[in-house]
């Protein structure tokens, strides 16, 4: 409050340097509609029941894992928990979702059990984001010092 841009900018840069964001998509239909992927890729991924998890890195979404069905998310989550265990000074975890929450509540509960001292925020994403991602999408982000 009352800070100048030159005072705030280093704080924001530090926050970005110590944060990670992963996005999981259950369907690529909305990415096809938005022109982000081709119609052919969308049809194939829908037919094969593809799921994808991506990491936001330097303003780009980098695929981390692709697979068929919800087992893809479970496999990714196991590796994600290990990543968090190796992260020093973990401060906060956020889980955002569009639509279905059952699996994500289990993720949240497992993370809270592993990291009881870390605040975990669990919230529905904004309509703008859910329009682009479609139902069943989620984001998990964390911040460390």
Name the predicted role of every residue range.
Residues 1-133, 137-145:
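Mixed-charge interfacial surface used for oligomerization/domain docking
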């Amino acid at each position: 409050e009352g800070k100048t841009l030159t005072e705030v900018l280093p704080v924001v840069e530090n926050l970005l340097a110590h944060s990670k964001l992963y996005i999981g998509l259950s369907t690529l239909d909305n990415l096809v509609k938005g022109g982000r992927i081709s119609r052919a890729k969308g049809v194939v991924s829908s037919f094969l029941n593809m799921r994808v998890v991506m990491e936001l890195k330097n303003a780009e979404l980098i695929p981390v894992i692709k697979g068929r069905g919800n087992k893809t998310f479970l496999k990714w989550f196991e590796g994600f928990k290990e990543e968090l265990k190796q992260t020093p000074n973990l401060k906060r975890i956020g889980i955002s979702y569009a639509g279905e929450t059952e699996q994500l509540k289990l993720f949240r509960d497992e993370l809270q059990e592993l990291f009881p001292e870390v605040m975990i925020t669990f919230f529905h994403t904004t309509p703008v984001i859910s329009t682009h991602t479609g139902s069943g999408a989620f984001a998990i982000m964390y911040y460390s010092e």
